[in-house]
Amino acid sequence: MLKNIMTKKLGRIGEIKNLREIWANEASDFTKWLAEEENLNLLSEAVGVDLELIKTEADVGRYSVDILAKESNTERKVVIENQIEPTNHDHLGKVITYAAGHDASLAIWIVRDAKEEHAKAIEWLNDHTDDSIGFFLLEIKVLKIDDSLPAP
């Protein structure tokens, strides 16, 4: 009976650890990619909120948030800060500054790797704000099967 079982060749899934191999520049490559409708829809699925792009590099005083969006059915503002590196204190401050500057109801921080202390800070913010404000910390991973195109 074992002789009748066909052996199937399977590919290997691998993770691309250096996201800069895919998006060399965070602002001009990753943010531009994420702001495209099909990719913003992927983010919408991940957070459970329908997002519509308002603007990339939206001003907040002397600074600018990577993506300013809105929730489709409520018009609530959403700020999206990208960091294709491990989390750091600087970007945590940016997320809060941009959310305040745009009176956003949701703040989404997309990172390569979330350090435990920053994940706890986001959890603390969610625990100590009311239900009208929410913070998301998402890790982006890029995978490949053998020689296939990379997929987020």
For every predicted segment, state its role.
Residues M1-P152:
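Charged, terminal alpha-helix-loop-beta segments
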